[in-house]
Each structure stands twice: as C-alpha cells, then as structure tokens.
C-alpha cells in the first residue's frame, strides 16, 4: 500500500519534493483559494501553525481553481497573496486539481484514505485533512469547520 510519504508535490516555485520530509510530523493538508468566502480562514490556519509548529506540526496549502474559479493566478501568486493579506508562513504549493480527471495523486490518496469519514470527492475550497505522525489520515474536515474548531483534534496528535 502506498504511503503519504511517497507522494511528490511541487512548491510554488516549481521545485518538487517528497512528503517524506514531514515523516514524524502532524500534517494538516488544505486545498486553498485566494478569492473564496472561506479565504479568511488563512488567518486561523496561520494561528494554528504559529501555536504548534515547534511541536512538529505543519500545514500544507494547495491552491486550487476548481471551485468557482477562485484561484485564478499561479501558485506563486497565491502564496504572495496569502503572505501579504494574511501573514501566511506555512508552505503554499503549486496549483493542483483536487478532483476530476487531473486530480493530483495526493488528493486521490487523501480522499480514498478518508473512507468512513466523508468518502466522497472534495466539494469546495478549504477542505482539511489531518494526518498523524505515522502518516495516517485521521480526520477530514469540511470547509465550514473553522481552524480554531479543530485545535482539540490537532492537540490529541501532538
């Protein structure tokens, strides 16, 4: 069976790397958009990151333009927007598709690994996947779930 650590992702500068560099970390993987009603969640996500990063907690943002065309720019533009408007310092990657024919393999894995949670395709921006230190998908959160509402779930894994 494949592991989350086998996946290769692209930074917003086009450089590729394997997720195995986060082995032993608690990860929160989020599909993001700069022009979405949920975009203010970047502020809450950054607060979570600031609070827990010293305990080996990482947030990985993956911009996506599949929902309402709310991420029209490049991954680099998305990252700049996040930094300028919300002070985001966690990694924002290159744009990906999170569903459909061109679905990024990581999001295929996440969606399937979340069986029994919400085993269905991602329906909107800011769907969040919580991964434990061993690489298991522990929980999937809907876009409506605000970052501060998932603190307890994160703390259980730290």
Swiss-Prot record:
The keyword Oxidoreductase appears for this protein: yes
Gene3D superfamilies: Glutaredoxin
Alphabetical list of CDD domains matching this protein: GSH_Peroxidase
Keywords: Oxidoreductase, Peroxidase
Superkingdom of source: Bacteria
Family per record: Belongs to the glutathione peroxidase family.
Protein name stated in the entry: Glutathione peroxidase homolog BsaA
Taxonomic placement: Bacteria, Bacillati, Bacillota, Bacilli, Bacillales
